[in-house]
């Protein structure tokens, strides 16, 4: 469950960004949907074989038509994989179900979350798994913390508020080296160059010279 930006230089192919909260399922061609459903079924079998109810938590900007089409396509894939899918919102201003009509005639129903001591769900809906399609760039909402009885995907430490791209690339560097050794290729062929620069703050305009030096070097 992610999207990856690839750069093809002709002589090497490497990922330059990975989004763990993908927002373009509506870009999948119709003929690829059976493959997407198959992949979803395989993941469900691996992570939670008994899963029946899935709670999807999307971004709060629920009037973005392109994003809503993405969410609808994601729900279609999961439903065809055998799950009951409903949508919950982190927007505390939503007090009851909100129905949103899409351009293709579909309708999405967004509902307020209900939190018990150890579980998160909706009114009359107790999910065994929760799928985040919200990057949490503004921080981790308390309502998502300390859920010990449900699968939360991706995990909270993957939120944009705490995740660091330098850590991601460092981990990918290890994976690329192991994979390259397995298939007997130079890891450079699939690994982008990256460097870690401390003290960069674009709002405060600090660390920009150090960043430029790292790029030039």
Labelled PLM ranges:
Residues 38-39, 62-216:
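Conserved N-proximal alpha/beta basic substrate-recognition cap immediately N-terminal to
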Residues 6-10, 47-49, 144-146:
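Short glycine/proline-enriched loop/turn "hinge" motifs that connect secondary-structure elements
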Residues 1-25:
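Conserved metal-phosphate-binding beta-hairpin within the catalytic cores
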